[in-house]
Design a protein with these regions (language model features):
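GIY-YIG nuclease catalytic motif and its immediate N-terminal context
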Residues: 1-80
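Generic alpha-helical secondary structure signal
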Residues: 40, 87, 102, 134-137
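Short, hydrophobic/aromatic alpha-helical segments in well-folded domains
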Residues: 62-63, 88, 139
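Conserved short loop/helix modules at catalytic or binding sites
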Residues: 82-129
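Mixed-charge (Asp/Glu-Lys/Arg
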Residues: 105-114, 134, 150, 154, ...
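Domain-level recognition of nuclease-like catalytic cores that cleave nucleotide substrates
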Residues: 130-149
Length: 159
């Protein structure tokens, strides 16, 4: 009941500036080099199966990075196979942020919504689905080395 009283105080000052033809479900896909998503943004894209994002992420494999915005540590991972980045990032959403990774699992156990509050997802390198898995894994190792994510001071990669 208190909520409606609060709305009553502001109702006459509110302006409807636009009525969208469909409910807002996030930003459109604008390119692999533009991906920089908070966990809630990624979760929204995956759970609503946003068609433009799904089409783009299902048809590419690649190297991605998860940044812990609380402490600056990073995790570099790769996605390869028939459903590409989409499938791998869906694993993170389904697992509340760890994607089956031991170190990330230990991190998110600290706080109930740790990943939701602190994880940021970005693409480092998009790779055609026709490229062989071993090449994707070599590129992942390159990024781990460059970004020092195997050093506990800077990252969450254990291998």
């Amino acid at each position: 009941r208190n909520d409606s009283l609060l709305l009553d105080q502001w109702y006459d000052k509110m302006v409807i500036s636009e009525i969208l033809p469909v409910p807002y479900i996030g930003e459109p896909f604008t390119g692999y080099d533009q991906i920089n998503l908070s966990f809630p943004e990624l979760e929204n894209i995956i759970l609503t199966q946003k068609p433009d994002w799904k089409a783009a992420l299902e048809t590419t494999q690649g190297i991605y990075m998860i940044t812990d915005t609380l402490n600056g540590k990073r995790y570099v991972g790769s996605a390869y196979g028939s459903n590409g980045i989409w499938s791998r990032w869906r694993d993170y959403v389904d697992s509340q942020g760890h994607g089956g990774n031991t170190e990330l699992s230990n991190v998110i156990k600290r706080t109930v919504n740790y990943a939701r509050m602190n994880f940021q997802f970005t693409m480092l390198e998009a790779i055609n689905l026709k490229v062989e898995e071993d090449i994707v894994i070599r590129r992942e190792q390159h990024w781990k080395t460059v970004l020092l994510t195997q050093n506990k001071e800077y990252g969450y990669n254990l291998n």
